[in-house]
């Protein structure tokens, strides 16, 4: 009955929420139109009433939801308390070793009730307690232990295996203190790195040697340029002497009288070789005409 009431209240709240939203939309559209002042005032009042009703409906909806949450939490607490009461704390015994661990509250309460009911003798009490403990341990422990171990051990093993394969491949050797697995993986990582370095080293060396060989022929080329320069200088001097000889020949061929004077000048020199001053005078005079006084003498 309580569930049906909650469902009805929820449906009524949803319907009121939708109708109020539609009324707000319609009132806002009418307010935008150029109506009379009285109509605008009434629409604004309706909008205020609708907005307040929406707020009230939201509060009611939240309150009902909180009430449902409190009911569910109370039901869960009752269920957990019932489970704890129905499942007593039993003895956990290893059948191979015969070791038993139990809560002290139950072990003390059980032997206290047995001697009062059966006999006042002290010898019969320990036998009855031991029989009860053995019966309880054998019936309750064996079906419960394998179920808990099988469910707990299987799922954590899988992520641990993936974790070891993914992470320990990148562990440096400085972290490994005494773990043999860590040292085994750590030795594999540096073995791969120096192999790559050895392949890169020989490729760089021949490139340096080729650059040194290319620089040697460049030093020999400027030496050849220096040897060609002194050969050009005597050619310039020979051209100058040829120009002087051509001037002398042109001057002497034009005037036959100066040839005889030139011969006399050469003959006057004691050594037979003309002096530079005499040769220079003869080269200057060809442009001037001969005087008549020199010819008559």
From Swiss-Prot:
Matches recorded under InterPro entries: G_prot
Start-end of Basic and acidic residues biased regions: 211-232
One GO cellular component term: extracellular region
Entry annotated with the keyword Transferase: no
Residue ranges crossing the lipid bilayer per the database entry: 38-66
Positions of the UniProt region annotated as Disordered: 105-160, 190-297
Compositional bias ranges of the Basic residues kind: 190-207
Residue intervals on the Extracellular side: 67-297
Region (Binding to host heparan sulfate) location: 187-198
Residues of the site described as Cleavage: 65-66
Lineage top rank: taxon: Viruses
Residue numbers on the Cytoplasmic membrane side: 1-37
One GO process term, biological-process aspect: symbiont entry into host cell
Biased composition (Polar residues): 254-286
Biased composition (Pro residues): 287-297
Compositionally biased tracts (Low complexity): 107-139, 149-160, 233-253
Keywords, comma-separated and alphabetical: Disulfide bond, Glycoprotein, Host cell membrane, Host membrane, Host-virus interaction, Membrane, Secreted, Transmembrane, Transmembrane helix, Viral attachment to host cell, Viral immunoevasion, Virion, Virus entry into host cell
Annotated disulfide bonds: 173-186, 176-182
Glycosylated residues (UniProt): 70, 72, 80, 86-87, 92, 100, 103, 105, 113, 119, 135, 137-139, 144, 147, 199, 203, 219, 231, 235, 237, 251, 253, 269, 275, 282-283, 287, 294
Annotated family: Belongs to the pneumoviruses glycoprotein G family.
Protein name: Major surface glycoprotein G
Source species of the chain: Human respiratory syncytial virus A (strain rsb6614)
Gene: G
């Amino acid at each position: 009955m309580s569930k049906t009431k909650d469902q009805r209240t929820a449906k009524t709240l949803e319907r009121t929420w939708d109708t109020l939203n539609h009324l707000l939309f319609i009132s806002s559209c009418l307010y935008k139109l150029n109506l009379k002042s009285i109509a605008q005032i009434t629409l604004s009042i309706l909008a205020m009433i609708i907005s307040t009703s929406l707020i009230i409906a939201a509060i009611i909806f939240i309150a009902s939801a909180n009430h449902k949450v409190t009911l569910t939490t109370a039901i869960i607490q009752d269920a957990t308390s019932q489970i704890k009461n129905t499942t007593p704390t039993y003895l956990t015994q290893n059948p191979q070793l015969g070791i038993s661990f139990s809560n002290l509250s139950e072990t003390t309460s059980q032997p206290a009730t047995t001697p009062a009911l059966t006999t006042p003798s002290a010898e019969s009490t320990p036998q009855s307690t031991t029989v009860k403990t053995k019966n309880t341990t054998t019936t309750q422990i064996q079906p419960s232990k394998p179920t808990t171990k099988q469910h707990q051990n299987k799922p954590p093993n899988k992520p641990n295996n993936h974790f070891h394969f993914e992470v320990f491949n990148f562990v440096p050797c400085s972290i490994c203190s005494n773990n043999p697995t860590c040292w085994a993986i750590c030795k594999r990582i540096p073995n791969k790195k120096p192999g790559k370095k050895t392949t890169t080293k020989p490729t760089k060396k021949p490139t340096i040697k080729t650059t040194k060989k290319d620089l040697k022929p460049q030093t020999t080329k400027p030496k050849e340029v220096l040897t060609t320069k002194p050969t050009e200088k005597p050619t310039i001097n020979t051209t100058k002497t040829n120009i002087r000889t051509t001037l002398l020949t042109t001057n002497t061929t034009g005037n036959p009288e100066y040839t005889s004077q030139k011969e006399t000048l050469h003959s006057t020199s004691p050594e037979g070789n003309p002096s530079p001053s005499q040769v220079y005078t003869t080269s200057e005079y060809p442009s001037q005409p001969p005087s008549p006084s020199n010819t008559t003498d």
